[in-house]
């Protein structure tokens, strides 16, 4: 067999392997979180649950993104600039038609834990589900109880995202998830105190501190949630200082 034919076969084999790998990556990224069974009890929207949810919603600063300047609370519409285009926050008021009024607790859990909407769409990681995946089910249920019972419904359609091709496709999101996202939960450190673990749970999960205070790669993925060494917030020209270095935010010395 000639060297040219061997080279062609090798190239064809490499291409086939690359395509197979890409297909596996897309399948993994797209299917992740798509087949959860709803084994959880019905949402307990009691006053106690709603009060806990209000506390958690403040801890996660949900209103900051989901409220447009001068707009109704939690009604969405605020644009979040990214290097790939602008993502507009959604309406999370309990309006049945334009908000999350028809969402079940599992729909909400799937969005928080898996980054997947009620209709099955993959969500843009501008919604920091890469951090929220560590939030426990009891806490996501409490947040939903607050949103459904303590927030006024606002009829306001979600604004379409303005994200450039090819980043605007579900295939691109599936590939990104296959590379950079794994659903998971918070793993407490048995060697640490209860308060330390509670703080780590908030910092790495609901507080999503790494969304600003950690460096990102060219595809927008941030480093590990515990790596809070500071980073430039993409498309905003603002540097979020290190939360560890004494010569920056200096939180370690507080």
What are these regions (language model features)?
Residues 57, 87-89, 122-124, 207, ...:
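Extracytoplasmic
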Residues 34-58, 175-204:
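Electrostatic cytochrome c docking/interface patches
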Residues 155-171:
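Extended, well-folded interaction surfaces typified by the phenylalanyl-tRNA synthetase beta subunit core
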Residues 53, 59-69, 108, 143, ...:
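The canonical Cys-X-X-Cys-His
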Residues 82-107, 130-138, 226-254:
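Electron-transfer interface patches adjacent to heme c in soluble/periplasmic c-type cytochromes
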Residues 21-27, 104-118, 131-156, 253-254:
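C-terminal capping alpha-helices of c-type cytochrome domains
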Residues 56-96, 100-101:
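Extracytoplasmic/periplasmic/luminal assembly and interaction segments
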Residues 2-37:
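N-terminal type II signal-anchor transmembrane helix
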């Amino acid at each position: 067999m000639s060297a040219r034919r061997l080279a062609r076969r090798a190239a064809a084999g490499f291409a086939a392997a690359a395509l197979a790998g890409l297909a596996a990556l897309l399948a993994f990224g797209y299917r992740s979180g798509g087949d959860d069974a709803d084994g959880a009890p019905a949402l307990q929207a009691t006053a106690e649950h709603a009060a806990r949810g209000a506390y958690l919603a403040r801890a996660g600063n949900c209103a900051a993104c989901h409220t447009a300047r001068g707009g109704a609370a939690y009604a969405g519409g605020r644009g979040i600039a990214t290097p790939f285009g602008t993502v507009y926050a959604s309406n999370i008021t309990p309006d049945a038609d334009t908000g999350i009024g028809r969402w079940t607790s599992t729909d909400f859990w799937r969005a928080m834990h898996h980054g997947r909407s009620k209709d099955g769409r993959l969500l843009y990681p501008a919604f920091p589900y890469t951090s929220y995946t560590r939030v426990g089910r009891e806490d996501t249920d409490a947040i939903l109880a607050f949103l459904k019972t303590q927030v006024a419904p606002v009829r306001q359609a979600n604004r379409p995202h303005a994200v450039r091709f090819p980043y605007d496709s579900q295939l691109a999101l599936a590939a990104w998830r296959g590379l950079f996202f794994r659903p998971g939960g918070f793993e407490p450190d048995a060697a640490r105190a209860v308060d330390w673990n509670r703080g780590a749970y908030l910092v790495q999960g609901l507080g999503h501190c790494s969304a600003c205070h950690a460096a990102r790669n060219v595809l927008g993925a941030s480093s590990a949630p515990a790596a809070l060494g500071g980073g430039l917030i993409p498309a905003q020209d603002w540097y979020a200082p290190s939360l560890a270095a004494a010569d920056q935010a200096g939180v370690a010395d507080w």
